[in-house]
């Protein structure tokens, strides 16, 4: 019973104008017909809910009077403050200011009194404190007639509405493009900038331009360190009071506004527009379309953020590492890496987070609530997105279709990877290698590969680089600066990416799982590269032999086979290698260590992959089969070498005489004819041989001669 009465008191302090969303005439004109219908439904539903709380009919606010006959909501007269006229205050609001229903002379929790003192504009009241509660005393000059003075009957409402319509006709300034009228010439000028695209107000710090001066003022606060609005719970400060209010909802966890479609709830009265925007997801509305790539969004803010992908504008720079971002929120999240600021604590388990959204996501692990259930197999999910993704496994539905070749895919990322073949959405093409790029900045950076220009030189060692970011990274190796330290073992790193990779060695976690095969990875970049295997896309092709690869790194490693460059030399035997990993594997021959032992037969191996391949012999596993003749192999390399018999491919060509070979060892043996090098020496007689097998045959002669 006590809970019910406290709930009634909270409702009693809420007015319709606290929860109503207002549109100006200009803003209302930007909505399409579907959005206007959705807005009307939400406002009428909100008013009905308030009437249900009171339990009887109350005089209607002016906004509802206009919405019911489907008139324009901006016709409601407002004062300069943007609030409805005092004469149109709702009966609900006035009723709850009467001594019978108001909070005066009632015992309330102290927390409620503190909240009321912040939001109420009632003056002349006194508060008396008791054990666990407080009482607001009625002001001496308060009279019951004052509460009912603002109630408006239907006759007054009708008179007022007709005056409102007459007032709106007095708008002499008309827009030549769309015909809208304005009562003030300055409002017309501001409106015309929408059609012209003119943005005369420029930020002196980053050069960004805006249509209106208030937009510029709001933006400039992001450059200054001034954050006057501080959270009294965690101490975090903000540029704007609205940001502080949104932030406080994270600590309270209040989400009173619930979506009837999916049950998702939203935080506060001030953010009812979030519910309004969320409902457009269920309605399937995506009115905001990108002019560059055609992608559509249900929110204008999402479109604006997306459009920055196509531009080169990254005005927000990290002062610690120099990394640049398109959005201020991305920079703010990134800065938490350097500061390790974790202000958001879970009250259930004490775990702390650097971002409020991470804390909200973490809350779901305690509730274990999975409201979205699959009607086919009964599996439940936390988010509707996960359910939609799961349901695709039960059907053959492939909704993501390629417009150029009619290939269809179950998931969006598969289509994106496939579209690389057609170079869709990459307007910048390199004339030297025909590679396509989405951004002009990436295209310019790529061209320096062909020109060989390396304008950025290191003052310490003289090494030159193509890009400035490469120079900045390199210079950290000369300095002892390692700002990213592991809290577990104290090891420090030059880059945050190195620290993140290192942290997985302590946890052993592989959180990024492939939905196709179930394989998991430590890093999301590894998962992205792995997904290309399932899509079958091999966009990186060797110009020398035509072989294709699904990773650029594999192509670069392969191209070293065609060149004579072997920079990694073994100090024990002088053998040289194209890749450092090959040298590392080779050096295990000299140290003699065979750490990986087979449990079946006791055979020991130097490298783990050798043990894995050996174990296939015991299980008679040969997963790599030739499509031409059906022959199977233990290793993929064995299959690739075998396929050259069918294709006739000879990738190893001698630059001296032009002769080509199928196998690398044949090419090396032939190349020694031109160089005159015979690296295999007999320890008995000192004779040299071109091939290792010739040395073995020769040594058998000495073995026969020995008694």
From Swiss-Prot:
Disulfide bonds: none annotated. InterPro entries: KRAB, KRAB_dom_sf, Znf_C2H2_sf, Znf_C2H2_type. Its main location: nucleus. A zinc finger (C2H2-type) spans 173-195, 201-223, 229-251, 257-282, 288-310, 316-338, 344-366, 372-394, 400-422, 428-450, 456-478, 484-506, 512-534, 540-562, 568-590, 596-618, 624-646, 652-674, 680-702. One of its GO terms (cellular component) is nucleus. Keywords: DNA-binding, Metal-binding, Nucleus, Repeat, Zinc, Zinc-finger. Residues 14-86 form the KRAB domain. The keyword Zinc applies. One of its GO terms (molecular function) is zinc ion binding. GO terms for biological process: regulation of DNA-templated transcription. It is found in: Nucleus. Gene3D superfamilies: 6.10.140.140, Classic Zinc Finger. Pfam families: KRAB, zf-C2H2. Expressed widely and evenly in most adult mouse tissues. It comes from the Eukaryota. May have a role during differentiation processes. Belongs to the krueppel C2H2-type zinc-finger protein family. This is Zinc finger protein 60. The gene is Zfp60.
